A protein has these predicted regions:
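Active-site His/Glu-centered metal-binding helix of metallohydrolases
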Residues: 159, 168-177, 228, 232
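Catalytic Zn2+-binding segment of zinc metalloproteases
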Residues: 172-191, 200
Length: 325
């Protein structure tokens, strides 16, 4: 059992949380020890915090290529700026202030601690975090000047504390990677495309933005941006299995408790092998995901495994201390 620092009993050993720094007393007979503040597992292993992390050190090559293709579309920046100038961030802030629970140091403090861990590790100013009731296992980041992160309640209920940290870190990764302008536009376009907007003041702007080339390019980039932020999540959790298990739950839903994790990883490797070697598999994977905002969870796992197995992740984690705190 973990208690607040001021309640530490000298009769029991204490462990300082590697993630948030909270000092916890641990009863020898209490079973798995977790931090009383962030609820993450206690361990004496180190946790690296990056003082000067450059986004280019972890941005996925596919993200970089898709963003270049998006920016090359004539008029894209003008159209997006018009849309965001009209909607601004007020709509996002009003919606979630009115319909969701704002996370603070005293409201859902373990979630606040997880946000603080992710921001401290990546070197990002803390955005506002909200929890909204929703049966979908999902989260998203919106806004530009003052981004907000929203976690759906079902996600918190379904995932472990470490997996929730991974999701929070993924969303913070969007901020660190400077995705928020295009990401907010992509999500807004996706929403407007599903809504009766023809009679709204945004009609002319929406018509401009919903050209096939712009929509396709935005969705293509948004899918690949997720791969970069999965890497950011790994830089925070510092455990590839946490990322893998999170994706397994996104794939299997409530059935995930009956899924063998090792076989799921083997499935991810098999998918990557076929994608790399078989043109037809690659064609169908690209066609099926072309209308989606997120890549397949199995593909995301295979990409994280590849990043780890190529040694790129380890190289970043073992960089000289001059680049990390």
């Amino acid at each position: 059992m973990a208690d607040n620092e001021e309640l530490i009993n000298n009769n029991f050993p204490s462990i300082r949380c590697r993630y948030c720094g909270q000092r916890n007393q641990v009863r020898p007979d209490a079973g798995e020890a977790r931090c009383g503040r962030c609820r993450l597992r206690l361990s004496d292993a180190p946790h690296k915090k990056f003082a000067h992390l450059d986004k280019e050190e972890y941005i996925h090559p596919a993200d970089r290529r898709a963003l270049a293709a998006l920016r090359a579309i004539p008029g894209i920046d003008t159209a997006l700026k018009k849309l965001l100038a009209v909607t601004g961030e007020s709509a996002i802030r009003v919606i979630f202030t009115a319909s969701a629970v704002k996370v603070t140091p005293t409201q859902c403090p373990d979630l606040y601690a997880k946000l603080q861990i992710a921001c401290t590790t990546l070197g990002v100013d803390m955005p506002e975090l909200f929890v909204q009731q929703n049966p979908v296992v999902n989260a998203f980041t919106g806004g530009v000047e003052r981004p907000v992160i929203v976690l759906y309640s079902q996600l918190i209920e379904r995932l472990s504390d470490e997996e929730v940290l991974a999701v929070v870190a993924h969303e913070v990764g969007h901020i660190h990677a400077e995705h928020v302008l295009y990401l907010t536009a992509a999500r807004l376009i996706e929403f407007l495309a599903k809504t009766a907007v023809l009679a709204s003041p945004l009609a002319s702007i929406v018509k401009d933005l919903l050209t096939m080339s712009m929509r396709a390019a935005l969705l293509a980039w948004a899918r690949r941006a997720e791969l970069s932020c999965d890497r950011a999540a790994l830089l925070v959790t510092q455990d590839a299995n946490v990322i893998g298990r999170t994706m397994m739950k996104l794939s299997g839903g409530t059935f995930a408790s009956r899924v063998d994790y090792d076989q799921f990883l083997a499935q991810a490797r098999d998918f990557q092998k076929n994608y790399d070697e078989k043109a037809l598999d690659r064609f169908w994977a690209d066609v099926i995901t072309s209308g989606l905002s997120h890549p397949f969870p199995v593909w995301r796992v295979s990409e994280i495994l590849r990043w780890v197995e190529t040694g790129e992740y380890r190289a970043l984690m073992t960089a000289p201390e001059s680049a990390a705190a």
